[in-house]
From Swiss-Prot:
Gene Ontology terms: cellular component: endoplasmic reticulum; endoplasmic reticulum membrane
One GO BP annotation of this record: coumarin metabolic process
Protein name: UDP-glucuronosyltransferase 1A7
Classification of source organism: Eukaryota, Metazoa, Chordata, Craniata, Vertebrata
Membership in a protein family: Belongs to the UDP-glycosyltransferase family.
Length: 530
């Protein structure tokens, strides 16, 4: 009888458990960025969907990677450009990096290849021009916004709908991360983005670091002028970059202190470096055949990322010449024109399973542009690197890995075939590179929580608590002179000067009185003698 009673109640218990699970589920708005930025953000979104959250992704109808195979609601809006326009402008930008590097805010502002940024920055105007979509978002009652800050549209959306936001990024160009999080960044040992400096800067480098910081404050507002105009138009009030970035609840930063130099951080800055790493799978048979044919020498993996498909012919031939002089088999991800001097040991492929190949025991080195995804896959799998940075954070990533003895950096504009050959032979034959990258790999993997789980936790945290105001520093409420304690310094200086002035006056008065009295005594004594 009792057993029958329990059996009868079983469906009720199941329903209660399911109800509890759904009660904890929230509603999340996702505003992503196209290209490689989406690769790891997608993994967080997919896990949130698996955990029962209702996810809505808002994206432009023109994109390279966005929204593919997502089991959630995807809302698109029309854009003022076509996919051909986007491809063309990106090719202009990428091709220009083979002739003119971006090493400062001024060079970025004055570059003639910035059309791709104008396209991306226009997305938010297109989104808010879709009144039907805006109305849908307004009525959806989201718990939070999960966003990539590259084009600032997610930040504008969060501010427009008054929603707490979780930013997902490697870093923020200009000074907007430090300003938005109110995080100190001493210029004496925290290098600015794009410079490719280490934390142990020479006097000259510290001078350049200060100049770069000044450049950012002078020129970044002009670079983001279109974004700020669009934001002001949408929010119907003058908007600064600080207004957009300073309301972020949590910063999910795709780095950690295995890659980064030690520096001050704030409590709402969460480090999830290596979130793109995963357990390597067996490589496809085609690639396994290449590996087996390489013999004892093994293979070298060569990829400049998903966004760089072609290399200038002269440079491609110099690279091909260097690759032909090493005994390893080289798997080169390349879709450009086949170099005429390509050696037999070099195999061109349009796609390769990068992480799986790096995890193969026969992989000896990785030639990379030093994007954060590739660098972390190299760290996770313990493969030394030859780095050829092109733009963005790549110069900084390369410098960090070179400083830690995990690879060699080459200037892609100036390097010769011999430079690449020597760099490859160094990282393959010098055991210190392998030992250093394995040490970094061990440090990176020694953590209490996996980066993906940590990212999911903090997104859910913001959804549950409608933000994280307890992590917001009071520095946001101070004026610039209060933040730097200039009013306190001024007051204390005034007190010291006042006390010094009064003391001086008292001493002067006492001295005059004393001197006057002594003078009168002398005068009286002199008159008596006469």
């Amino acid at each position: 009888m009792a057993r029958a009673g329990w059996t009868g109640l079983l469906p009720l218990y199941v329903c209660l458990l399911l109800t509890c699970g759904f009660a904890k589920a929230g509603k999340l708005l996702v505003v992503p960025m196209d290209g490689s930025h989406w690769f790891t953000m997608q993994s967080v979104v997919e896990k949130l969907i698996l955990r029962g959250h209702e996810v809505v992704v808002v994206m432009p109808e023109v994109s390279w990677q966005l929204g593919r195979s997502l089991n959630c609601t995807v809302k698109t809006y029309s854009t003022s450009y076509t996919l051909e326009d986007q491809d063309r402008e990106f090719m202009v930008f990428a091709d220009a990096r083979w002739t003119a590097p971006l090493r400062s805010a001024f060079s970025l502002l004055t570059s003639s290849s910035n059309g791709i940024f104008d396209l991306f920055f226009s997305n938010c105007r297109s989104l808010f021009n879709d009144r039907k979509l805006v109305e849908y978002l307004k009525e959806s009652c989201f718990d939070a916004v999960f966003l990539d800050p590259f084009d600032a549209c997610g930040l504008i959306v969060a501010k427009y709908f008054s929603l707490p936001s979780v930013v997902f990024a490697r870093g923020i160009f200009c000074h907007y991360l430090e300003e938005g999080a109110q995080c100190p960044a001493p210029l004496s040992y925290v290098p600015r983005l794009l410079l490719g400096f280490s934390d142990a800067m020479t006097f000259k480098e510290r001078v350049w670091n200060h100049i770069m910081h000044l450049e950012e404050h002078l020129f970044c507002p002009y670079f983001f002028k279109n974004v700020l105009e669009i934001a002001s138009e949408i929010l119907q009030t003058p908007v600064t970059a600080y207004d957009l970035y300073s309301h972020t609840s949590i910063w999910l930063l795709r780095t950690d202190f295995v890659l980064e130099y030690p520096k001050p951080v704030m409590p709402n800055m969460i480090f999830i470096g290596g979130i793109n790493c995963h357990q390597g799978k067996p490589v496809p048979m085609e690639f396994e055949a290449y590996i087996n044919a390489s013999g004892e020498h093994g293979i070298v993996v060569f990829s400049l990322g998903s966004m760089v498909s072609e290399i200038p012919e002269k440079k491609a031939m110099a690279i091909a010449d260097a690759l032909g002089k090493i005994p390893q088999t080289v798997l080169w991800r390349y879709t450009g024109t086949r170099p005429s001097n390509l050696a037999n040991n070099t195999i061109l492929v349009k796609w390769l399973p990068q992480n799986d190949l790096l995890g193969h025991p026969m992989t000896r080195a990785f030639i990379t542009h030093a994007g954060s995804h590739g660098v972390y896959e190299s760290i996770c799998n313990g493969v030394p690197m030859v780095m050829m940075p092109l733009f963005g954070d790549q110069m900084d990533n390369a410098k960090r890995m070179e400083t830690k003895g995990a690879g060699v950096t080459l200037n892609v504009l100036e390097m010769t075939s011999e430079d690449l050959e020597n760099a490859l032979k160094a990282v393959i034959n010098d055991k210190s590179y392998k030992e250093n990258i394995m040490r970094l790999s061990s440090l990176h993997k020694d953590r209490p929580v996996e980066p993906l789980d940590l990212a999911v936790f903090w997104v859910e945290f913001v959804m549950r608590h409608k933000g994280a105001p307890h992590l917001r520093p009071a520095a946001h409420d101070l004026t610039w002179y209060q933040y730097h304690s200039l009013d306190v310094i001024g007051f204390l200086l005034a007190v010291v000067l006042t006390v010094a002035f009064i003391t001086f006056k008292c001493c002067a008065y006492g001295y005059r009185k004393c001197l006057g009295k002594k003078g009168r005594v002398k005068k009286a004594h002199k008159s008596k003698t006469h």
